[in-house]
Amino acid sequence: MAFTFKQFHIDDLNCGMPVSTDGVILGAWSPLSQAQQILDIGAGSGLLSLMAAQRSLGRITAVELEEKAAAACLYNMVQSPWADRLSVIHCDIQDFCQQTQYHGFFDHIICNPPYFEHGPQANDSHRAMARHTNTLGFAPLLDAIIQCLTPQGYASLILPSQSMPRFKACLTSSKLHLTEEVLVKSVENKAANRVLLLLSKNRQSDYRQSELTIRGIDGLYTKHMIELTRDFYLKL
């Protein structure tokens, strides 16, 4: 399927996970404006990389394990206005992190990680790979962030609320700290089902927690959601 945003176009036909609201929210929320070197882990179609290119002047490196998704990501990058600042590498993030030139290299890392921790996988192997933590668990993801992030850098993630206890357990035993947390509600009168996270290597005293509601009880986007995504969605 193809998606047209205000400044770029995404073709995600060969990607395990299509363009999602989760990805758009993460790409719009992450503090990227000052970043010079950005790493997109598990890039898929390249949505987050392209959003990062629109929102910053930095260079973006995307890493994608699945071959067809990496090809789609490259295609979308080449078609964009920022092709000279975008690149994709087809490899496992753990192999990527073994390359010493990337140690402590990126001042922002962004990732919409796999989110099914267990249970039956999708019939389509590409979709299964994108959706299940079997291919990238939380501990290896945090290790990759620690290796590649600069001392003063940040990492932005979005996770299902139900995954937070296990994620925070892994975080506690890592060298990363939770700086900001946004509880995301799909509808105004529902409990939060997603969480936006900002991580850093430095423990900060101004930890922040807030909420984002995507739609009101009338089914329309909230003012907050419109303000967050208006630079991307065509109809806002």
From Swiss-Prot:
<dbReference type="InterPro" id="IPR029063">
    <property type="entry name" value="SAM-dependent_MTases_sf"/>
</dbReference>
<dbReference type="InterPro" id="IPR002052">
    <property type="entry name" value="DNA_methylase_N6_adenine_CS"/>
</dbReference>
<dbReference type="GO" id="GO:0016430">
    <property type="term" value="F:tRNA (adenine-N6)-methyltransferase activity"/>
</dbReference>
<dbReference type="InterPro" id="IPR050210">
    <property type="entry name" value="tRNA_Adenine-N(6)_MTase"/>
</dbReference>
<keyword id="KW-0819">tRNA processing</keyword>
<dbReference type="InterPro" id="IPR022882">
    <property type="entry name" value="tRNA_adenine-N6_MeTrfase"/>
</dbReference>
<keyword id="KW-0949">S-adenosyl-L-methionine</keyword>
<dbReference type="GO" id="GO:0008033">
    <property type="term" value="P:tRNA processing"/>
</dbReference>
<dbReference type="GO" id="GO:0005737">
    <property type="term" value="C:cytoplasm"/>
</dbReference>
<comment type="function">
    <text>Specifically methylates the adenine in position 37 of tRNA(1)(Val) (anticodon cmo5UAC).</text>
</comment>
<dbReference type="InterPro" id="IPR007848">
    <property type="entry name" value="Small_mtfrase_dom"/>
</dbReference>
<keyword id="KW-0963">Cytoplasm</keyword>
<dbReference type="GO" id="GO:0003676">
    <property type="term" value="F:nucleic acid binding"/>
</dbReference>
<keyword id="KW-0808">Transferase</keyword>
<protein>
    <recommendedName>
        <fullName>tRNA1(Val) (adenine(37)-N6)-methyltransferase</fullName>
        <ecNumber>2.1.1.223</ecNumber>
    </recommendedName>
</protein>
<dbReference type="GO" id="GO:0032259">
    <property type="term" value="P:methylation"/>
</dbReference>
<comment type="similarity">
    <text>Belongs to the methyltransferase superfamily. tRNA (adenine-N(6)-)-methyltransferase family.</text>
</comment>
<dbReference type="Pfam" id="PF05175">
    <property type="entry name" value="MTS"/>
</dbReference>
<keyword id="KW-0489">Methyltransferase</keyword>
